């Protein structure tokens, strides 16, 4: 009779037990993994809050009026907050107004904005400018009226042109790289250092990245430009007339029209 062979048992008696013992002996040499205690704490470095509620903060009826979480995350672009720069909405209104009066497309306006920025670098952005501005088409001068540029600029043309400050600075650097170049604004201010040519335009926007020497140069340029300027609040009122009657009577012997005779004395020398 054929014997029934179990495939799970070693052919030799006791073979399966021996394998189990060998596996146990091989595991004795290994260290048991340590369990990690989820409740344990390391020596963490304390972090201080940048703005705490213990500061003297503005309060109304015992409630703080600031949202500290929002204040910590509020880090806007500094130049966007300057009141010396036109807002984005004011700049867009100026752009659309100029485009409508010149009757140009957006692509054509892109060509116009380049030479107008260069013209302002050379001639400034004074509110008193009038007439025409000029761009070059090869060797030919092409004239455009300044009226749309100035009248649509709110609050002022200089505040509008502050949006072009970085582009103008990069343009001057490009011109200086190809040869000696100093904007006319710098020539009028007698700026002698060619390395400061990139700051020699009147709509340069001073920011946190501007070096101390450059800020000094910009301040000196503005002071020199405004040294002889006098602004009068009121001009001559042409609607005011003298209504009083002058009843003074003078003779030929009087000293002058405002002084009677001095009884033989001559006029004071």
From Swiss-Prot:
Residues 1-45 are annotated as: Disordered. InterPro entries: Poty_coat (IPR001592). Disulfide bonds: none annotated. Residues 9-36 have a biased composition (Basic and acidic residues). The keyword Thylakoid does not apply. GO terms for cellular component: viral capsid. Genome polyprotein of potyviruses undergoes post-translational proteolytic processing by the main proteinase NIa-pro resulting in the production of at least ten individual proteins. The P1 proteinase and the HC-pro cleave only their respective C-termini autocatalytically. 6K1 is essential for proper proteolytic separation of P3 from CI. Pfam families: Poty_coat. This is Genome polyprotein. Keywords: Capsid protein, Virion. Belongs to the potyviridae genome polyprotein family.
